[in-house]
From Swiss-Prot:
Assigned keywords, A-Z: Repeat
Organism encoding this protein: Arabidopsis thaliana (Mouse-ear cress)
Superkingdom, taxonomy of origin: Eukaryota
Record carries keyword Translocase: no
Name by which UniProt lists this protein: Pentatricopeptide repeat-containing protein At3g60050
PPR repeat spans: 148-182, 183-217, 218-252, 253-287, 288-322, 323-357, 358-392, 393-427, 428-462
Similarity field: Belongs to the PPR family. P subfamily.
């Protein structure tokens, strides 16, 4: 890409004015005496000590009331969840819930629905969807209570997890009939589930025609739809929606162009990518921080460190300081291209520029070293990040455990698993399955079984044990 075509951007720097009002102003005392400041002592009728004590007392009382309310809601939610679990043939959920005599509030509804969502599994999907809807109907019938948009969204999430797509659509209709507008969050929930079911286009068409779609904070409904489609990687559908958008007389903005640029890159349409970039400039839109992030990703994966350096320098010239995100995106791309020397160069340049590498950046570097078989450098980077106060996350640990296993250092890998748990970082299924798979390949079957037993003992991924027994990396 010819970066000479990149237009400069006007940088608007907001000035913030802070106004400090001192209590000293009440009595005219600015550190001098009556003669120094020219004002006599003023009595504002404010006894500071007694009033502060009173305010503190009120604060404690408010906090206490709030704590009691939260405790009461959590306790009531637990009772409701236990009651719903009693569901059997002939079970009258309405009368049983009435007998609980709980105070229905938005918090109670949220806690119950979240509780159902957490307990949802492959075996109880249909039951969970039914119980959630029964509770939703019952709570909506209680006096002095009305469901919120968040309540509808939580129930939609449960329906989505349970594969109840028709129920989701009916709930959207109920939500609109109840006077609530559909939002970008509503559409996002629908598109995530409908995309998996092959109904994404149907959802898009309905929202494009909807008169109750509250698309804020986006410029128009099309941007809200395009943004959600990008999140679920519906690239072909993005192209179709963009054509509909132009036919309806809507103009693209920087966000629209960024979505289209990324879409065409993912579809491998680089000629179209270049044309869009030029079109963006002709329409008077300067590349923003996200546009440059896309460019750096492409240059990184294309193993073009010199062009990337030119882009970073150009960003500074137009007033956009490269952030940790920009450097990490570039380093990730170069790492995937196998250019770890360039990765280290840009990591050092990042530090020189005053950007502190975060856990994601370090994890990208560690993963790159592991993949290339440079375990010693991965270990060194792991030590460096902890010394500099960046706590490893589950992805960091997974990369390190994989690297140790690849090098046959199984004792260290098992020790690292215990370390991450002691630091409050819960291993995910990938961590366990990676370790078990490599132990098996090395013929260390007893050690592999021990890891599985520890996992089950802690209650982690018990339902996935059969999958792990067949797991091969």
């Amino acid at each position: 890409m010819n970066l000479a075509l990149v237009l400069g951007t006007n940088v608007v720097r907001k000035a913030y004015r802070f106004l400090f009002i001192s209590r000293k102003f009440c009595n005219g005392n600015f550190g001098g005496n009556e003669i120094d400041n020219g004002f006599p002592d003023l009595d504002c009728g404010f006894d500071e000590d007694s009033n502060i004590s009173e305010l503190r007392s009120i604060d404690r009382e408010v906090i206490s009331v709030r704590s009691r309310f939260l405790e009461s809601a959590n306790h009531s939610a637990s009772r409701v969840l236990v009651t719903l679990q009693l569901d059997e043939s002939g079970f009258n959920s309405k009368s049983v819930l009435d007998e609980l005599n709980v105070r229905v509030s938005g918090l109670l509804v949220r806690e119950v629905l979240v509780g159902i969502l957490r307990n949802l599994s492959y075996d109880n999907k249909a039951r969970c969807a039914k119980l959630a809807y029964r509770f939703f109907l019952w709570s909506g019938e209680q006096e002095c209570f009305r469901h919120t948009v968040n309540s509808y969204h939580l129930l939609m999430k449960i329906f989505a997890e349970c594969g109840e797509y028709k129920a989701m659509w009916r709930l959207v209709d109920e939500m609109v009939q109840d006077g609530f507008p559909t939002t970008a969050r509503t559409f996002n929930l629908l598109i995530c589930s409908c995309g998996e079911a092959g109904l994404a286009k149907q959802a898009v068409v309905q929202f494009m025609k909807s008169k109750t779609f509250n698309y804020r904070p986006f410029k128009h409904s099309y941007n809200a739809i395009l943004n959600s489609l990008l999140g679920v990687k519906q690239y072909k559908l993005i192209e179709w929606v963009y054509k509909q958008m132009l036919e309806d007389g809507f103009s693209p903005d920087v966000l629209t162009y960024n979505i289209l640029l990324w879409t065409n890159y993912r579809l491998g349409k680089m000629d179209r990518f270049d044309r869009l970039f030029d079109e963006m400039a002709r329409d008077g839109f300067s590349p923003d921080s996200y546009t440059y992030n896309i460019l750096l990703h492409i240059l990184g994966k294309g193993n073009k460190p010199l062009a990337a350096l030119t882009t970073l320098n150009h960003m500074k010239e137009v007033g956009i300081d490269p952030s940790v995100l920009h450097y990490t995106t570039l380093i990730d791309g170069l790492s995937r291209a196998g250019n770890l020397e360039a990765c280290k160069y840009f990591l050092d340049e990042m530090v020189k520029a005053g950007c502190r590498p975060d856990v994601v950046c370090y994890t990208v570097m560690i993963t790159g070293y592991v993949v290339s078989g440079e375990l010693d450098k991965a270990k060194e980077m792991f030590r460096e990040m902890t010394v500099k106060g960046q706590l490893p996350n589950v992805f960091t640990y997974n990369s390190m455990i994989r690297g140790l296993c690849m090098a046959g250092e199984f004792r260290e890998a098992c020790w690292l698993l215990k370390e991450m748990e002691s630091r409050g970082c819960n291993p995910n299924f990938v961590v366990y399955s990676t370790l078990v798979s490599y132990l098996r390949k090395a013929g260390k079957l007893s050690e592999a079984r021990k890891v599985i037993r520890e996992m089950v003992k802690k209650g982690h991924y018990v339902h996935l044990v059969p999958k792990m027994m067949k797991y091969r990396r």
